[in-house]
């Protein structure tokens, strides 16, 4: 199983970097993990809606260039499907049974994801109706992927 995580922007906070490193190490026993960062574009607070779309479209071009034809693409979206940890584990397990050995999770930048990425998405996943910083979302996603593999393999993991 290959899992790629494409994320807009770099992680700057040390505590988040440490958490990402820890879960990346733990996941190495269950899958081949590849974290891909694409540069975010600076977005001023007072951008018009059309300017926001331009920023999202430019970030989307960078994201799309990293997505392979063989990827099953799961985008993280506020309006996506909200799952329990057990249901996410079942989703990942079912994808492998269906022959999808390359899963790609996509985390957008501060303005969200551009239309071309949303159109390429095979599944929209939401962790909450809350908005999270994309750096923190990367850590939360890694923890949930790790938890999923523990559930799939009937291994203990704290609740």
Swiss-Prot record:
Positions annotated to bind S-adenosyl-L-methionine: 76, 108
InterPro entries linked: Alpha/beta_knot_MTases (IPR029028), RlmH-like (IPR003742), tRNA_m1G_MTases_N (IPR029026)
Places the protein is found: Cytoplasm
GO cellular component, one term: cytoplasm
EC number: 2.1.1.177
The keyword Cytoplasm appears for this protein: yes
Ranges annotated as spanning the membrane: none
Role: Specifically methylates the pseudouridine at position 1915 (m3Psi1915) in 23S rRNA.
Annotated family: Belongs to the RNA methyltransferase RlmH family.
Protein's UniProt name: Ribosomal RNA large subunit methyltransferase H
Organism: Finegoldia magna (strain ATCC 29328 / DSM 20472 / WAL 2508) (Peptostreptococcus magnus)
């Amino acid at each position: 199983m290959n899992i790629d995580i494409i994320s807009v922007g770099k992680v700057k906070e040390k505590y988040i970097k440490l958490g990402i490193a820890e879960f990346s190490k733990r996941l190495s026993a269950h899958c081949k993990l590849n974290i891909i960062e694409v540069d975010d574009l600076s977005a001023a607070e007072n951008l018009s809606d059309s300017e926001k779309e331009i920023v999202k479209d430019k970030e989307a071009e960078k994201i799309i260039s990293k997505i392979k034809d063989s990827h099953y693409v799961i985008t993280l979206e506020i309006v996506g499907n909200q799952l329990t940890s057990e249901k996410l584990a079942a989703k990942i397990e079912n994808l492998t049974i269906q022959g999808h050995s390359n899963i790609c999770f996509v985390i957008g930048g501060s303005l969200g994801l551009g239309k071309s990425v949303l159109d390429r998405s095979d599944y929209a996943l939401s962790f909450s109706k809350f908005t999270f910083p994309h750096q923190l979302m990367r850590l939360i996603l890694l923890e949930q992927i790790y938890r999923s593999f523990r559930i799939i393999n009937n291994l203990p993991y704290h609740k």
